[in-house]
A protein has these predicted regions:
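Conserved AdoMet/S-adenosylmethionine-binding subsite of the radical SAM
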Residues: 1-92, 99
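C-terminal accessory extensions appended to soluble enzyme cores
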Residues: 78-152
Length: 152
């Protein structure tokens, strides 16, 4: 929320996921970004996965989990980081100064937790399978104008 002002809270996203799945709408969550030293602790990851399980999501994508800082957004990211998280700014500089990809030190543990949770609850996490699903998903609303507000 601090780095991306205006974004909805996880609890708000959970509420929307529940509303969608209750209406039979397939939900795939893109679990990203996972930011080192900010939201990469296992308690946070397990909390996010718990939301997904409770909401009954179809799948969880993780291929964009590690942010890639390209020219332009790198400067903005570090400005926001310094402004909102000055206590960890130096850690980022020390660990990620020359890195484009912000891969958390917990990456392997996080991926294992995601895999175990998905397998235990029948949630799809294979990227290729999720992409295949989205390509083959039959649009049952052709010719119908939808509004997100009709669902609330």
């Amino acid at each position: 929320k601090k780095l991306e002002p205006g974004t909805s809270l996880p609890s708000e996203r959970f509420s929307l996921m529940q509303q969608l799945t209750e209406r039979g709408i397939t939900v795939i969550v893109n679990l990203a970004p996972i930011l080192p030293f900010i939201n990469d602790d296992m308690e946070n990851i397990q909390g996010l996965l718990s939301y997904c399980v409770k909401a009954g999501v179809y799948g969880i994508l993780t291929d964009k989990m590690c942010p890639v800082l390209r020219e332009g957004n790198r400067e903005r990211f570090y400005q926001q980081l310094y402004k909102n998280f000055p206590d960890i700014y130096d850690q980022y500089e020390a660990v990620y100064a020359d890195e484009k990809t912000l891969k958390t030190k917990n990456y392997t543990e996080i991926m294992a937790c995601i895999r175990e949770t998905c397998e235990a609850h029948g949630i799809q996490y294979d990227k290729e399978e999720l992409l295949r699903f989205t390509r083959e998903y039959k649009n049952k609303t052709i010719g119908t104008q939808l509004s997100l507000f009709d669902m609330m």
